[in-house]
């Protein structure tokens, strides 16, 4: 998902940065508001950030100019809401660009938009729909994390197709090519991420019930099943 340094045209890099900036700014406001109201949530916020950093650092080669990896943003989106994940993802992506050579500074805005905005908002929406449909809690967690991961990569494929349309088939043909190559690695990774997120949520429900009690998480103190 990390689009590499200098790969996008300048106008695309600027456009994605402009689109991402207000969401990240609102996310900072959202986090400050939540932490000021419930200071005990700092630990859970740290867990969500660490989960995102570790999973998204596990990359493997994929489409030219990008790579495949879990995103780890579903957990934070479920716990704190999608807007709070935007600044977390932005910091994670910045550190990875500077320290691990994953992604880059010129493509930071595009990577934030896909991994830290679209993915978390998709995960939160799926989780809410699953709860509204009365799916088991664990199924909702699994679907949210897995589909949030997949939609992150659909967004990256769209970004690449928009920047590099096929000479004959245009955007649609290019999107099919990018998405098809991503799917080979990303579908198994998304399933794995969904299962791992359920495991982590189980641990949080077992050891951090008090902190989770201040969040709108309906685990009822029970371990969840995928």
UniProtKB/Swiss-Prot annotation:
One of its GO terms (molecular function) is cobalt ion transmembrane transporter activity. The chain crosses the membrane at residues 6-26, 43-63, 75-95, 107-127, 135-155, 181-201. It is found in: Cell inner membrane. It comes from the Bacteria. Pathway: Cofactor biosynthesis; adenosylcobalamin biosynthesis. Keywords: Cell inner membrane, Cell membrane, Cobalamin biosynthesis, Cobalt, Cobalt transport, Ion transport, Membrane, Transmembrane, Transmembrane helix, Transport. It is a multi-pass membrane protein. Pfam families: CbiM. The keyword Ion transport applies. GO terms for cellular component: ATP-binding cassette (ABC) transporter complex. Belongs to the CbiM family. NCBIfam families: cbiM, PRK08319.1. Part of the energy-coupling factor (ECF) transporter complex CbiMNOQ involved in cobalt import. Forms an energy-coupling factor (ECF) transporter complex composed of an ATP-binding protein (A component, CbiO), a transmembrane protein (T component, CbiQ) and 2 possible substrate-capture proteins (S components, CbiM and CbiN) of unknown stoichimetry. This is Cobalt transport protein CbiM 1. It comes from Pelobacter propionicus (strain DSM 2379 / NBRC 103807 / OttBd1). The lineage of its organism: Bacteria, Pseudomonadati, Thermodesulfobacteriota, Desulfuromonadia, Desulfuromonadales.
């Amino acid at each position: 998902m990390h689009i590499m340094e200098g790969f996008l045209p300048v106008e695309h890099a600027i456009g994605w940065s402009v689109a991402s900036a207000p969401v990240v700014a609102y996310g900072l406001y959202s986090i400050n508001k939540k932490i000021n109201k419930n200071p005990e949530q700092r630990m859970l916020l740290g867990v969500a950030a660490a989960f995102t950093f570790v999973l998204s650092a596990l990359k493997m080669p994929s489409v030219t100019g990008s790579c495949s990896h879990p995103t780890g943003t579903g957990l934070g989106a479920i716990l704190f809401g999608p807007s709070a994940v935007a600044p977390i993802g932005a910091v994670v992506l910045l550190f990875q660009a500077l320290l691990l050579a994953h992604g880059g500074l010129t493509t930071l805005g595009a990577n934030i938009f896909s991994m830290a905005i679209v993915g978390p908002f998709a995960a939160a929406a799926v989780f809410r729909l699953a709860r509204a449909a009365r799916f088991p809690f664990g199924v909702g967690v699994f679907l949210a994390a897995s589909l949030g991961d997949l939609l992150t990569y659909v967004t990256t494929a769209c970004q690449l197709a928009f920047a590099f349309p096929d000479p004959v088939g245009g955007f649609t043909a290019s999107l099919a090519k990018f998405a098809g190559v991503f799917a080979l690695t990303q579908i198994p990774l998304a399933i794995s991420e969904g299962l791992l997120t359920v495991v982590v949520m189980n641990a949080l429900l077992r050891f951090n019930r008090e902190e989770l009690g201040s969040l709108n998480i309906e685990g009822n103190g029970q371990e969840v099943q995928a």
